[in-house]
Amino acid sequence: MTQQPILSRIEYFTQLTDFARTAKKGDTVYVATMGFKPVYEPVNDLIQQLIGAARRGAQVTVLIDAFAFSHPDGTEVGPLWYSRSLTATLSRAFKYKAQCVNDLREAGATVIITNKPRFRFANPVAGRSHIKFAITNRDVYIGGCNLTDPHQVDAMVVRRNDPEAAKILIDFTAKVAAAPRNTVRLALDGRDSVVTLGDGATLIIDAGVRRHSTIEQTALQAITKASRNVFITLQYPPYGALVATLDRARRRNVACTALFNTPQRFAPPANVLMAATCMAMQVRGRALLALNELRHSRRYMHAKILVADDTLIIGSHNFVNAGVRFGTAEIAIMYNSAELASRAQQLIARQLGAPLL
């Protein structure tokens, strides 16, 4: 296996699209996402190329979490929130999503809607699969990139020529395809998966059991062991066990930097909750005082990266326990590599267009 580059979201889209454009019989493409918004041109281009690849005989498999069809899109309610059918609505936002799924299937691709709700009117953020990965033949991509806004700050690590990791994720997909409601938790029998790969990297999949996350615990342990520096990116202000662990690291004179979106980046009511979280941390004098919010960038932070000394964790997990409480399936890969850790930080700086604070 060759060295692993780390890509931004648009670079990830470009590589997948370029592969799909020429893929034919004998080629394999897998793409897993939680968010799905083909209204964005790069996402739509990728979907159209996947349709073409399937028509040419390539094995194309797309996993889309039910969140994309149950959570509101703007002011429009998702069809899987009140129905079992993707076509139960004529609303504009969801009509084209459903058309893309239908076009993929008609072309011969397999589309799996993961973690479908058991009941109508269920909480659309509970029991989700937040897992994102892709496979193009023997190359494997793992990280946090949704098939949504291409301009968000994000990260995917690429494992070139890695049939071992590819087989693990292909076998995982087969289990999900066979599970009731295509639910990750049931596919994995409620057990998180931890596999040490040939190069020493660790691939972790959280099954989505409520109040349990191997990825979260691994991240907290890495911060606890750090002696020099901690660098973390996440969507939300850190809170709970994460902010307490960061605060203890800061008190050990570990240099801590956290990049996350300010409350103003979120729509109501989430912005109020985020502002309250930030205020509570400031009142308690916790680690927020030593952290850096994303005030110098207009771009939305979606990357989930943790660097603790030479340890790098990159994946779909935000390292806070909101998703853990709701039972969210996640994926991450962990390396012990100063070079990769540095490269991940450089990727974030490049996307922000500014040196890291």
Predicted regions and their residues:
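Short acidic, glycine-rich surface-loop motifs adjacent to enzyme active sites
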Residues: 29-36, 232-234
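HKD-type phospholipase D/PLD-like phosphodiesterase module
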Residues: 2-27, 35-225, 259-311, 317-333
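Beta-propeller domains
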Residues: 207-222, 228-248
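Short, surface-exposed acidic/glycine-rich loop or hinge patches that mediate macromolecular interfaces
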Residues: 10, 236-237, 263, 338
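Hydrophobic side-chain positions on well-ordered alpha-helices
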Residues: 53, 248-249
